Regions:
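Electropositive, beta-rich accessory/interaction domains or terminal extensions
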Residues: 1-129, 135, 170-234
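A short pocket-lining beta-strand/turn micro-motif at the edge of beta-sheets
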Residues: 35, 146-148, 160-162
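Loop/turn positions that initiate beta-strands
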Residues: 105, 155, 159-162
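Active-site glycine-rich loop that binds ribose-phosphate moieties when present
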Residues: 131-138, 142-152
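Short hydrophobic beta/alpha edge segments that flank linear recognition/processing sites
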Residues: 163-167
Length: 234
């Protein structure tokens, strides 16, 4: 299966300065437009991560966010007219490719680089502070308009002129379906088993799904969605 998903992306972004908002370190709104990105096995050259445990590492080297989602979030009243790519902290912006079109485990070629889709973005409370909206992370979780992460199978250079090509499809679970299965509020062992069968799924998601099955319950999402009480927005 070789299929051109996008013949030209909208933008590539990276930034190495961390900014502070509400006393929180973040690399989310420091990204600048780049003509090319140099991609390594565990990082993008010139791209900083304030919280590598949750937003970096080998399973989350590149974040791809569909640009059309900005319009949806504007219509929901969650972001302003001036907020556009790369305000979600994305490295790759495109139009015409969404979470429904990409599957967990997909292997893609992009310029010199070979990538594998590992997980949807797990929305966290830093988004609430980024946009001054108490429930932004929850809205992203519920709508599924989160974008997705790639691991790097073959490093190299990518350019804005490069096409994104699907080389192999390894699973039948789209990023959109993975969001629904993972963030369903009711415990669902069958759904977790299905996700765990996905080749290429990020190790952090594998671990959390296995813990759910061992405990027979879902972890508390309050801290991820809203942060500590001292930082919660009213």
């Amino acid at each position: 299966v070789t299929k051109c998903l996008i013949d030209k992306i909208s933008g590539l972004y990276a930034g190495d300065e961390l900014t502070f908002r509400d006393k929180l370190a973040s690399g989310i709104d420091n990204k600048s437009r780049m003509d090319t990105l140099e991609v390594f096995g565990d990082r993008v050259a010139g791209d900083a991560q304030a919280d590598p445990k949750h937003h970096g590492g080998p399973d989350r080297v590149l974040h791809h966010f569909p640009r059309e989602h900005y319009g949806h979030y504007r219509r929901m009243g969650l972001i302003t007219a001036g907020q556009d790519a790369p305000a979600m902290g994305e490295n790759i912006s495109s139009v015409g490719l969404t979470e429904a079109d990409i599957h967990i485990g997909d292997i893609l070629s992009f310029g010199e680089v070979e990538l594998q889709v590992t997980q949807p973005r797990s929305p966290c409370f830093k988004l609430n502070h980024q946009y001054g909206q108490r429930d932004f992370a929850l809205a992203m979780q519920q709508t599924g308009m989160s974008g997705w992460f790639y691991r790097v199978l073959k490093p190299g250079i990518i350019s804005c002129q490069d096409a994104l090509i699907l080389k192999q499809r390894r699973t039948d679970i789209s990023v959109a379906e993975a969001m629904k299965l993972y963030f369903r509020p009711e415990f669902d062992a069958a759904a977790y088993d299905r996700l765990l069968s996905c080749e290429g799924l990020a190790a952090s998601w594998v671990g959390s799904l296995q813990r759910r099955l061992e405990r027979g319950s879902i972890e508390d999402w309050q801290m991820r969605l809203y942060g500590p009480d001292s930082l919660a927005l009213n």
